[in-house]
Amino acid sequence: MRLMSITIQKDACLVCYACQAECPTKAIDIDSFKVCNLCMECVKVCPTGALVEEEIEVNGKKLKRVNYLAHKCEKCGQCAEACPIGIKKVDDDFPYSKGHCVLCQKCIDVCPIEIISLPGVIDKPKKEIKPPKEPIAVTDACVGCGICVPECPVNAITLENNKAVIDKSKCIYCSICAQTCPWNAIFVAGKIPKKRRKEVKKFEVNAEKCIYCLKCVEVCPGDMIKVDEENLIVIPPKSCPACKLCVNICPVDALDLEVKLSSPHPITDEGLVIVEEDFEVLKKCASVCPTEAIVVDEEKKEVRMCIVCGACTVACPTGALKLGKIEHNGKEYNRIEFSPYLCDKCGKCVEVCPMKTLRLSRGKLPLKGYCVMCLLCLSVAEKEKKGKKVLELR
């Protein structure tokens, strides 16, 4: 028997969370790209025999996997403590012990671009990712879904002949389109974009409305919508790239897809970024921000933060907003500079702000919500969460 584990080609991943949603034991975490490597450390430390090593045959080869016997589990947590990659956890929701791979291969089957494999047993050809060298480029992978169009803060993207077209005279190269593209078809500055986190809150089909025309099945670029021939209905996946081509093509509006996107990342991996969305800590960070660039939504328990994309500086007709520089720890960072005496309160900056942090205000400071990179918030975050990063300067 051999120890084989699931592998994911990280650089090609769409971050659609389909594999994570499909995994019955929560052995995949896409945000951190952690996958159970079947090291069997959890089995070794389990004091009750609830976790056992088991032999399974896959494609004629004998492999080892972890089996969980819930009736023996005392929820002691020793397995989670022993896990070297931190994917194992124990809680009160069944199955109590999670994060071990059972080699069910559901993740392999559901991946829309076939980048998940079981090396030596189920091999998928490695996808070569070669970002175009242009400042910004839309590749042939574009499916014409239009998800990028409303996300652009300066309205530089249109759809022409079912493909995204970028007006380079308007584009500010903030990379929000690349971060948001469901099918990895947009690249900025020749780099593979860091994708925005995505949560499919709801993906349902109305059985009474569905006429079984299968147009949604045909249009799905990843073949992720399945057919129930017996009941004459389609079955959407638990999670997917969420391009909404299926929703748009449905002639009877039978599909309901609700998606929540996280805030965009900074233009590069450098700058002030939220590492962990700890609402209470971030709320304290917001309280010290001199320009109120961290906005707290108490109702939704969400926090938005200026990402210094520069969209406001491009939209400003008076020159009141500029993209400046500031040095921290010997390194130069972008920041937003505001000259109140030049501001005529036209509100154009507010309209284009992708994070919706900018807002007009009365008094000596007519505009709030832009980041000056003073790092007061970072000081609070480090004080409140010792040993655990909530904010980070990269």
From Swiss-Prot:
Keywords assigned by UniProt, alphabetized: 4Fe-4S, Electron transport, Iron, Iron-sulfur, Metal-binding, Repeat, Transport
Residues at which [4Fe-4S] cluster binds: 13, 16, 19, 23, 36, 39, 42, 46, 73, 76, 79, 83, 101, 104, 107, 111, 142, 145, 148, 152, 171, 174, 177, 181, 210, 213, 216, 220, 240, 243, 246, 250, 306, 309, 312, 316, 343, 346, 349, 353
Highest taxon in the source lineage: Archaea
Keyword Thylakoid annotated: no
SUPFAM superfamilies: 4Fe-4S ferredoxins
UniProt entry tagged with the keyword Iron-sulfur: yes
A GO MF term: 4 iron, 4 sulfur cluster binding
Domain 4Fe-4S ferredoxin-type: 4-33, 26-56, 64-93, 92-121, 133-162, 162-191, 201-230, 231-260, 292-326, 334-363
Cofactor(s) annotated in UniProt: [4Fe-4S] cluster
Entry note: cofactor: Binds 10 [4Fe-4S] clusters.
Stored InterPro entries: 4Fe4S_Fe-S-bd (IPR017896), 4Fe4S_Fe_S_CS (IPR017900), PSI_iron-sulfur_center (IPR050157)
PANTHER family: PHOTOSYSTEM I IRON-SULFUR CENTER-RELATED, POLYFERREDOXIN PROTEIN VHUB
Protein's name according to its UniProt entry: Polyferredoxin protein VhuB
